[in-house]
Amino acid sequence: MNTNRKKMKVHIGGYVLILALTVSVILQQPELVTGQARVPAMFVLGDSLVDAGNNNFLQTVARANFLPYGIDMNYQPTGRFSNGLTFIDLLARLLEIPSPPPFADPTTSGNRILQGVNYASAAAGILDVSGYNYGGRFSLNQQMVNLETTLSQLRTMMSPQNFTDYLARSLVVLVFGSNDYINNYLMPNLYDSSIRFRPPDFANLLLSQYARQLLTLYSLGLRKIFIPGVAPLGCIPNQRARGISPPDRCVDSVNQILGTFNQGLKSLVDQLNQRSPGAIYVYGNTYSAIGDILNNPAAYGFSVVDRACCGIGRNQGQITCLPLQTPCPNRNQYVFWDAFHPTQTANSILARRAFYGPPSDAYPVNVQQMTLLH
């Protein structure tokens, strides 16, 4: 596809785009460096962007346990909302640890939890009500309960001093916010939040709830916490397909709504770092990273930025990927796998930018630098 850069321009609210030289450096970083694990464990909370299969065990329509999901994981659908690996799988490789298993899987117990657990659940939001239109899901609050269950088990598996050190060196990743908009605020036919709250007030509601749980992580003894912001949702096929803007343009009104949340989350990270001795909270600038990819697709090897590889209708985003649907053959040239989620190739770029990137990608330090702090 011949993308028109002027038409595709993503407005990213003042964020600085990465220079071509930085792009080249990030893309040339090795996929996996053999050696000692950089962290003892990684605990993952979030939504479908990082779900590793928890929703397979819930009564919900938000599932990805069927082909063509997993087509590039030896045709094995695991519940990941991707053609292959998620952001977390690829970050785990960079950290040189196994990808954390899903909490809801009955086999996630014993020694299997020692290097971390994934609690993420498709359709989950910061607010309990977000995503209810899909059925069962573990909200942020429930995922925190599930995390505490795991920590109680781990406490019995090591000495008190070792447990304290283990928690302090482990990494926590939280990926929330998308469903509070896509499956709440931007669905006025099902939710009244857009009537009750102006965009800044809704963002403040989300941030206050988020802050409470981020502080809870500190009280539990966790000290390294990575918090990616929300991507430019107005550019995903699902939102393009609504017909608010031409099909080759992002929905700017949606992206503008997200600005307050992302800016507030970055400010919250500053506040948390000031009031949490010995901890490091890091903001991941997903909005800018995706915006950079969409504005400069050729620099990353992409040729299709405005429609899904697997989906139906306008932008292949009106109906998301269906069981046994035939996806596009050139998946590494697509930014979006289905109506909502990036391809494995796009996830790989996001993971590398989080791990190696400058402060415009990960603030105030990147994930690699986080692992070196004690």
From Swiss-Prot:
GO terms for molecular function: lipase activity. Residues 1-28 form the signal peptide. It is an enzyme of class 3 (hydrolase). The keyword Hydrolase applies. It is found in: Secreted. GO terms for biological process: lipid catabolic process. Keywords: Glycoprotein, Hydrolase, Lipid degradation, Lipid metabolism, Secreted, Signal. One of its GO terms (cellular component) is extracellular region. InterPro entries: GDSL (IPR001087), GDSL_esterase/lipase (IPR051238), Lipase_GDSL_AS (IPR008265), SGNH_hydro_sf (IPR036514), SGNH_plant_lipase-like (IPR035669). PROSITE patterns: LIPASE_GDSL_SER. Belongs to the 'GDSL' lipolytic enzyme family. This is GDSL esterase/lipase At1g71250. The lineage of its organism: Eukaryota, Viridiplantae, Streptophyta, Embryophyta, Tracheophyta.
